[in-house]
From Swiss-Prot:
Designated name of the protein: Autoinducer 2 import system permease protein LsrD
Localization, UniProt: Cell inner membrane
Coiled-coil regions listed in the entry: none
GO molecular function: transmembrane transporter activity
Lineage of the species this protein comes from: Bacteria, Pseudomonadati, Pseudomonadota, Gammaproteobacteria, Enterobacterales
Chain ranges passing through the membrane: 7-27, 45-65, 67-87, 90-110, 118-138, 162-182, 212-232, 240-260, 261-281, 288-308
Length: 333
C-alpha cells in the first residue's frame, strides 16, 4: 500500500505502457516483437535524454523551450568543427561545452533580468535556431543533406548494441539513474523541490537559488548536446533541424510523467515511463498507417488532457467544496 501511495502514478504509467503495446499489437503483430520494441526506441529516445533534466527545470518552477534549437546548433557546430579538421575526440567535448554554454546563457538571462523563463527561452529558441541556420549556410550545408562524411566509427556508434540493447537506450537508462539519484537522493535535488514550491521562502532560507538554476539549465544544455551527438551519429549527417520536432513530445512526457507545470513536484521515473508511452504511441500509430498529422494532433490532445487532469487533481479539494455548496443550496431550496 505504501509503495502504491509513493509510486502510484508511475505504476499507472507502467500499466498504460503495457496496455498500449498490447492494443497496438492486436493491429500489427510486429509491435509485440521484442527486437522491434527495443530498436524502435532509437527513433525517439533522444527526446527522453533531454526530458530528464527538463523535468528538474520544470520542478524548480522554470521552463526551457529552447532545447530543440540547442540540439540543432550543437549538431551543426559538430559538423563544422569536424569539417575544419578537428578530430572527433576533441569535437565531441567542444560540442558538449557549446550545449552547456547555451544553458548558462538561458540561466544568466533569467537571473539577471527577472523575466519569465518562458519568455527568455522563447527568445533564445530563435537566437540558437537562427545561429544554427546561419552556421549551416556558411558551411554550405543545404536541404536535408546537412554535413556528412563523418568517420565510420562515429556513425556506427548509435547503431551498435551493448548487452543486446541499442546504445542510445543504454545511455538513456544511465541518464535516468543519474538524474533520479541527483533529484531524489541529494541536497541539490531537495533544493530544486523547495525552489519550485516557493522561491520566496527558498530565498529567505538562504538556499543557493542562482547556483541551482545555473546547474539545471546547464544540464539541459548538456543533455541537448548529447542528444545532438547521438542524432548526428544515428543519421550520419549534421543538420540544423535535428531537434525541431522535440518540443511538444518532451514537454508532454514531463507533464504526463507527473511534473507540476507550476513547479514543486515531479518524478524522473515518471518522465522516463512517459517518454516510452509517448514514443510507442507515435511508433504504433505509424505502424498501423496513421498519417503524421493525426499522430501530432493526438500528442497535442494528450498534452491538453494531462494538463487539465493535473489541474483538476491539484484543485480537487476546491472542486469538492464547490460541489458540497451546490448540494447544500439545492437541499435548502
Amino acid at each position: 500500500m505504501n509503495l502504491y501511495r509513493r509510486y502510484g502514478w508511475e505504476l499507472t504509467l507502467a500499466a498504460l505502457l503495457v496496455l498500449e503495446i498490447l492494443l497496438f499489437g492486436l493491429s500489427n503483430s510486429r509491435m509485440l516483437d521484442i527486437n522491434v520494441l527495443l530498436f524502435s526506441t532509437s527513433d525517439f529516445i533522444c527526446i527522453g535524454i533531454v526530458a530528464l533534466p527538463l523535468t528538474m527545470v520544470i520542478v524548480s518552477g522554470g521552463i526551457d523551450i529552447s532545447f530543440g534549437s540547442t540540439i540543432g546548433l550543437c549538431a551543426i557546430f559538430l559538423g563544422i568543427v569536424f569539417q575544419a579538421g578537428v578530430p572527433m575526440s576533441v569535437a565531441i567535448p567542444l560540442t558538449v561545452l557549446v550545449g552547456a554554454l547555451c544553458g548558462l546563457i538561458n540561466a544568466g538571462l533569467i537571473l539577471y533580468t527577472g523575466v519569465n523563463p518562458l519568455v527568455i527561452t522563447l527568445g533564445t529558441l530563435y537566437l540558437f535556431g537562427g545561429s544554427a541556420l546561419l552556421l549551416s549556410g556558411l558551411s554550405g550545408a543545404t536541404g536535408y543533406e546537412g554535413i556528412g562524411g563523418f568517420p565510420a566509427a562515429f556513425t556506427d556508434f548509435a547503431n551498435q548494441t551493448l548487452f543486446g540493447l541499442p546504445i542510445p537506450l543504454v545511455i538513456f537508462m544511465l541518464c535516468v539513474l543519474l538524474f533520479w539519484l541527483l533529484m531524489h537522493r541529494t541536497h541539490s535535488g531537495r533544493h530544486v523541490f523547495l525552489i519550485g514550491q516557493s522561491s520566496r521562502v527558498a530565498r529567505y532560507s538562504a538556499l543557493p537559488i542562482a547556483r541551482t538554476l545555473c546547474m539545471l539549465y546547464a544540464m539541459t544544455g548538456v543533455a541537448s548536446a548529447i542528444a545532438a551527438i547521438l542524432l548526428v551519429s544515428y543519421f550520419g549527417s549534421a543538420r540544423s533541424d535535428l531537434g525541431a520536432s522535440f518540443l511538444m513530445p518532451a514537454i508532454t512526457a514531463v507533464v504526463l510523467g507527473g511534473a507540476n507545470i507550476y513547479g514543486g513536484s515531479g518524478s524522473i521515473l515518471g518522465t522516463a515511463l512517459a517518454v516510452l508511452l509517448v514514443g510507442y504511441l507515435q511508433q504504433g500509430l505509424q505502424m498501423i498507417g496513421t498519417p503524421n498529422q493525426i499522430s501530432s494532433a493526438l500528442s497535442g490532445a494528450l498534452l491538453i488532457l494531462v494538463v487539465v487532469g493535473r489541474s483538476i487533481s491539484l484543485h480537487r479539494h476546491l472542486i469538492y467544496e464547490w460541489l458540497q455548496r451546490r448540494r447544500s443550496r439545492k437541499a435548502s431550496v
